[in-house]
Amino acid sequence: RTGASVFVHSIKNQLLANRILEKRISQELDKPEPDLSRVRACVKQLQESNEMLISRSEELYRTAKNKSVTLVPTTLGQIRETTLERFRRKYPDALLECRLNESETVLADGNYLSEALYNLLTNAWEANVDAGHGDRPIRLSSSRERLYVVLEVRDEGCGMTKAEQKKIFEPFYSSKNSNTSWGMGLYHVRTIVRAHVGSLRVESKPGRGTSFFVLLPKYVQDR
């Protein structure tokens, strides 16, 4: 499914799940001798659910609002530092190979571009884990292609069919459980890349993993 129906369905399911948790807490507390460990477990689930709803709502807001980027000469080393700092906070034990020409310079808004790469790295690592390949690294590398600097994020996940590749950049599309993923990540990434006068492409085959390529115009300093 695609479109706003997924968004509405996801919120509804989460709120219904929260209602069930609230009912369980209330029923347990009404007992003469409530099991506080069960209450704490339900409270923890409720907190996690609410945090997820807040996080996804913020993600949707960031994607929906107009992007106002400030492009300045930025090295890949600077982008790498910001991106990996955020990624390591979420997945400190993830296996990652990083091969960037750190002195290469592009015109970029460092915060937004790092956010896009963070999304791609997060997707890549989760694809590895979902495929049972948590013992294999994901890769972030750079190269040159004519007038562009190319950033590649590569995973060893299950890969995608051609049909899936045609849908992944649509807003609200997701191959994951719609209750936990609202399918804004890649749409958000492409929005950021386009704001950098760049492009985003994907190469993938079922069972062979996936590569995402971010193409950004090379920065050439005026002489």
Regions found by a protein language model. Give the residues of each.
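Conserved HAMP-HisKA connector
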Residues: 1-10
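Conserved DHp (HisKA) dimerization/phosphotransfer helix of two-component histidine kinases, i.e.
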Residues: 17-93
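Conserved catalytic submotifs in the C-terminal HATPase_c
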Residues: 95-105
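Short conserved segment of the HATPase_c
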Residues: 160-172
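Short alpha-helical Gxxx[C/S/T] motif in the catalytic ATP-binding
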Residues: 185-189
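Detector for a conserved hydrophobic position within an alpha-helical segment of the HATPase_c
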Residues: 193-194
